Amino acid sequence: VLDRTLTFLGYNKKHVMNITDIGHLSGDSDDGEDKMLKTAQERHQSVLEIADFYTKAFFNDIDRLNIIRPDVVCKATEHIDEMIELIKKIEANDHTYMAGGNLYFDVTTYPDYGKLANLNLEDLKAGARVVVDENKRNPHDFVLWFTKSKFENQALVWDSPWGKGYPGWHIECSAMSMKYLGEQFDIHTGGIDHIPVHHTNEIAQSEGATGHKWVNYWLHNEFLVVQKDKNSTSDEAGKMSKSSGNFLTLQTLIDKGYDALDYRFFLLGAHYRSQVMFSWTAMDSAKNSRKALNQRVAKILLSAKDTAIT
């Protein structure tokens, strides 16, 4: 919708999307599991095979939903050199320290840390949990480059000035966006769950490297949620996600007789900053409404054609 709107309004846009095929953890902080490595080990496949499978599945769904593909699709594993060069700039500006074999970003060196989430560093320190990584000076410091992996048999590693290892997952977004969009660009999108950690860290490292503003506008979308299970002890609806077990695939909807565009129409019924509650009743309503809209448009086009002939 954003892509089509900007194009309709006459803006010269360039849409860049990254594919995280290295170092993606199950959470935004450094203490999560490595999703790619875990899945590869479970399926007895390589990390790149797992990444390729899900990338193809993702774009297959994108096409079925009639979503315009990005102008640039870039893989993290193909931009390691750019990440290393960006980390060098951050290091040259005295924002880093080595500890336990890993290179960390020191958030105390960036005064505006937490501004996206309207949090200051002192408030963050006061509410911090027990630090899992004892090498960190501050619980909110984050890894720019790992040489001492906590994961056994880390599949992909590269040479770097800090030793053989791999990048933290925040740095890829900054490095690739700067390569294709420059040191400052207009719009960065993402889920609201990325505000307090991932996007906050992106800003710190990007502006720590360049010394100026990185992104002009942030657009954060809310979650698609599902009604709680009858056996749940929570009164709240849950985010639809694979990790929680309460998720549906686009193919599931198609198998139940819905068109992929019925699902797209369902999502368009809510503001992007509002949670969307999924239900089969809502899907039926979206299916019927889209059918009625298509019929009305067809009648208008037929009427216009007849008028032109007359």
Where do the protein language model's features map onto the residues?
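Alpha-helical recognition segments enriched in aromatics with Gly/Pro capping
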Residues: 1-6, 59-60, 81-303
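N-terminal, positively charged nucleic-acid-binding surface of large information/translation enzymes
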Residues: 1-66
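Residue-level recognition of the N-termini of beta-strands and the immediately preceding loop/turn
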Residues: 13, 70-72, 185, 215-216
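Short, glycine/charge-rich beta-strand/loop segments that flank catalytic centers
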Residues: 16-23, 51-58, 68-83, 101-109
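The substrate-binding groove and active-site-proximal loops of carbohydrate-active enzymes
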Residues: 38-47, 72-77, 163, 191-192
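Short, intrinsically disordered, charge-balanced linker/junction segments flanking boundaries
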Residues: 305-310
